[in-house]
Amino acid sequence: MSEAPVYTLKQLAELLQVEVQGNIETPISGVEDISQAQPHHIAFLDNEKYSSFLKNTKAGAIILSRSQAMQHAHLKKNFLITNESPSLTFQKCIELFIEPVTSGFPGIHPTAVIHPTARIEKNVTIEPYVVISQHAHIGSDTYIGAGSVIGAHSVLGANCLIHPKVVIRERVLMGNRVVVQPGAVLGSCGFGYITNAFGHHKPLKHLGYVIVGDDVEIGANTTIDRGRFKNTVIHEGTKIDNQVQVAHHVEIGKHSIIVAQAGIAGSTKIGEHVIIGGQTGITGHISIADHVIMIAQTGVTKSITSPGIYGGAPARPYQETHRLIAKIRNLPKTEERLSKLEKQVRDLSTPSLAEIPSEI
């Protein structure tokens, strides 16, 4: 790798289109977390939970918002003031200092097995031991990592990044700039069986497609099944974390986020800009409205028709869930109070010796 470049804060401000507060000639040669940064590093502050690090950080400069810069101006630090998310500006800064890591296998590796009917566009990188099946189509500038498999009649758009050991089975249609992390499987048969007269479970053929829109990202070891007859669709801009299960004929709307270990059962429709928290389970054949947020470990058993934050199992509006959790937390105290009340009632209903007649 080449030596890291050095920029002054003035140069960084021009490149990032931000404002400098402090010494514009401060040299910066790297990026680092705010808690670990040294004088040659630039760091960022986005979440105010970490503002305690700002006072003692050794960073040569910190990227933050205008309101944060005003709040912490008394610290006399070097600030780069951004009008967008500090984290997003910091990401642009990373790209100035850190070179992309490549495998060192440019072009099409000789160990790759490519069917004669497959169509490979220009500037495609195909790493060792990749298999590309008949009538597959790989778009220009796409990168396919070692050991990956592209199934028959599948289409990958331009500028896709397929990491090693990915399986894209037959009948997967992928848009442009899609990223798939290692171990993911797209296009598996759905979990569909029919039980015969002898009680044996017979698998059903799944003939649908998996359709993935532009700018979708799919995490490691995530699985997306194709439908029996209809398609499983992931619309543009959606980001899916690791170890997520998307069942047959699910549709996920644009720009949604699905966090690790969530599971969506068959034929469910997820709206746009939905956030599904980790380990959330969503039953099949329901729909989720746009702009719904499900906190971690939510259990969704019926359709959600209104935007908002939901939690619990079964899912309910978060404020209701929060109140229910508070009541459950107070159950031991409630039980103790109830026991005392029951004892008082028993004492009141039991006559004293003075009240019992001495003669009958």
From Swiss-Prot:
Gene Ontology annotations of biological process type: lipid A biosynthetic process
Gene Ontology CC terms: membrane
Key words, A-Z: Acyltransferase, Lipid A biosynthesis, Lipid biosynthesis, Lipid metabolism, Repeat, Transferase
Enzyme Commission number: 2.3.1.191
Keyword presence, Disulfide bond: no
Active site: H248 (proton acceptor)
Pathway(s) annotated for this protein in UniProt: Bacterial outer membrane biogenesis; LPS lipid A biosynthesis
Annotated transmembrane regions: none
A Pfam family per the record: Hexapep
GO molecular function, one term: N-acyltransferase activity
Reaction(s) catalysed (UniProt annotation): a UDP-3-O-[(3R)-3-hydroxyacyl]-alpha-D-glucosamine + a (3R)-hydroxyacyl-[ACP] = a UDP-2-N,3-O-bis[(3R)-3-hydroxyacyl]-alpha-D-glucosamine + holo-[ACP] + H(+)
Function per UniProt: Catalyzes the N-acylation of UDP-3-O-acylglucosamine using 3-hydroxyacyl-ACP as the acyl donor. Is involved in the biosynthesis of lipid A, a phosphorylated glycolipid that anchors the lipopolysaccharide to the outer membrane of the cell.
Family the UniProt entry places it in: Belongs to the transferase hexapeptide repeat family. LpxD subfamily.
Subunit: Homotrimer.
Name listed for the protein in its UniProt record: UDP-3-O-acylglucosamine N-acyltransferase
Source species of the chain: Chlamydia pneumoniae (Chlamydophila pneumoniae)
Source taxonomy: Bacteria, Pseudomonadati, Chlamydiota, Chlamydiia, Chlamydiales
